[in-house]
Amino acid sequence: MDLENKVKKMGLGHEQGFGAPCLKCKEKCEGFELHFWRKICRNCKCGQEEHDVLLSNEEDRKVGKLFEDTKYTTLIAKLKSDGIPMYKRNVMILTNPVAAKKNVSINTVTYEWAPPVQNQALARQYMQMLPKEKQPVAGSEGAQYRKKQLAKQLPAHDQDPSKCHELSPREVKEMEQFVKKYKSEALGVGDVKLPCEMDAQGPKQMNIPGGDRSTPAAVGAMEDKSAEHKRTQYSCYCCKLSMKEGDPAIYAERAGYDKLWHPACFVCSTCHELLVDMIYFWKNEKLYCGRHYCDSEKPRCAGCDELIFSNEYTQAENQNWHLKHFCCFDCDSILAGEIYVMVNDKPVCKPCYVKNHAVVCQGCHNAIDPEVQRVSYNNFSWHASTECFLCSCCSKCLIGQKFMPVEGMVFCSVECKKMMS
């Protein structure tokens, strides 16, 4: 398929999750409706990951595409109908007999994802070492956490040009090259093993020198065959604490098998969240999630959340923006050369600020223009003028004077306060 056709096929999937309730805003949101270029809901401004959208197949397609043309093709299967690669995530179902007074019932626990290891006891141990609120048990807080991290850590628009907004043919080509590069140089999937299993593979394969693993015997004493000296002490690459004997560890091939992590320590070095499904990116001796690895390589537009492949973009408020996306967060009007106000790290044009966000003057009860000086105390504000910032009793101007605040009113003296009480 040529680049022109690829550009024509691009779309943000606006029908996906339409009407889904917002888990954060509850009834305040009318239901999910994707903004035409931002990756947020038009109704409540929350991201798709904050809505109760059924995305299992879509997420499996996304991760399947990520693993396509990599050494991790064993984790994907291509659909016969359209050849789309699908992620074969490992689902683990545990059954535990529960004793009752008269009979024995079976308690079934389903993990929406588990490490793809043959030893189920090892997978169970891995899960138990994660914080309970992050264990992906179906229908639990942990499953919701995994779903949210899949969306946050591995944005589809960081790997698929068709999920981006109006890329030029040149930008599509540059993005494809970028994705190909990170797949070959940074992408990896963690491997759960017992540290003693790795010993059996020998030091040559494990790259022992220079690692965070220490052997108790010096080189001159290596001929001592006693079990005490042969035992190896392991420490976590992240927290530096010792690994307990018999506990599973995570290895990252790109980091070298001399490094290992506690299951709960296998996190992104930027956001410090668990690396979802143990999918990592390795750079400069650090683990990253997909999002923060890409952020370390390319600027990201604060408007559309996409990586910027254009040579021209703007920087404002310590953030990067596509030229066409430096817009008012409320009405989408272009802000280049216009007055704007930052509200919760989002730029808002002056008319929208006055209409939707401006504080109201306690004196005249009108909105305070963002360019006008004001006086604020606790949650109350006044125009800094002789007409508004006055004693609530005698109307004396209080600019530059001491005052006594009482529930939205201000007084010049105790006497005035008493007269109004």
Swiss-Prot record:
<comment type="similarity">
    <text>Belongs to the prickle / espinas / testin family.</text>
</comment>
<dbReference type="Pfam" id="PF06297">
    <property type="entry name" value="PET"/>
</dbReference>
<dbReference type="InterPro" id="IPR047120">
    <property type="entry name" value="Pk/Esn/Tes"/>
</dbReference>
<comment type="function">
    <text>Scaffold protein that may play a role in cell adhesion, cell spreading and in the reorganization of the actin cytoskeleton. Plays a role in the regulation of cell proliferation. May act as a tumor suppressor.</text>
</comment>
<dbReference type="GO" id="GO:0005829">
    <property type="term" value="C:cytosol"/>
</dbReference>
<dbReference type="GO" id="GO:0032991">
    <property type="term" value="C:protein-containing complex"/>
</dbReference>
<feature type="domain" description="LIM zinc-binding 2">
    <location>
        <begin position="299"/>
        <end position="359"/>
    </location>
</feature>
<dbReference type="InterPro" id="IPR010442">
    <property type="entry name" value="PET_domain"/>
</dbReference>
<feature type="domain" description="LIM zinc-binding 3">
    <location>
        <begin position="362"/>
        <end position="421"/>
    </location>
</feature>
<feature type="domain" description="LIM zinc-binding 1">
    <location>
        <begin position="234"/>
        <end position="297"/>
    </location>
</feature>
<dbReference type="InterPro" id="IPR034960">
    <property type="entry name" value="LIM3_Testin"/>
</dbReference>
<dbReference type="Pfam" id="PF00412">
    <property type="entry name" value="LIM"/>
</dbReference>
<dbReference type="InterPro" id="IPR001781">
    <property type="entry name" value="Znf_LIM"/>
</dbReference>
<dbReference type="InterPro" id="IPR033724">
    <property type="entry name" value="PET_testin"/>
</dbReference>
<dbReference type="GO" id="GO:0005737">
    <property type="term" value="C:cytoplasm"/>
</dbReference>
<comment type="subunit">
    <text>Interacts via LIM domain 1 with ZYX. Interacts (via LIM domain 3) with ENAH and VASP. Interacts with ALKBH4, talin, actin, alpha-actinin, GRIP1 and PXN. Interacts (via LIM domain 2) with ACTL7A (via N-terminus). Heterodimer with ACTL7A; the heterodimer interacts with ENAH to form a heterotrimer.</text>
</comment>
<dbReference type="GO" id="GO:0005925">
    <property type="term" value="C:focal adhesion"/>
</dbReference>
<keyword id="KW-0440">LIM domain</keyword>
<dbReference type="InterPro" id="IPR034959">
    <property type="entry name" value="LIM2_Testin"/>
</dbReference>
<dbReference type="GO" id="GO:0005886">
    <property type="term" value="C:plasma membrane"/>
</dbReference>
<keyword id="KW-0965">Cell junction</keyword>
<protein>
    <recommendedName>
        <fullName>Testin</fullName>
    </recommendedName>
</protein>
<feature type="domain" description="PET">
    <location>
        <begin position="92"/>
        <end position="199"/>
    </location>
</feature>
<feature type="compositionally biased region" description="Basic and acidic residues">
    <location>
        <begin position="155"/>
        <end position="164"/>
    </location>
</feature>
<keyword id="KW-0862">Zinc</keyword>
<keyword id="KW-0963">Cytoplasm</keyword>
<dbReference type="InterPro" id="IPR034958">
    <property type="entry name" value="LIM1_Testin"/>
</dbReference>
<dbReference type="GO" id="GO:0008285">
    <property type="term" value="P:negative regulation of cell population proliferation"/>
</dbReference>
<keyword id="KW-0479">Metal-binding</keyword>
<dbReference type="GO" id="GO:0008270">
    <property type="term" value="F:zinc ion binding"/>
</dbReference>
<feature type="region of interest" description="Disordered">
    <location>
        <begin position="133"/>
        <end position="164"/>
    </location>
</feature>
<keyword id="KW-0677">Repeat</keyword>
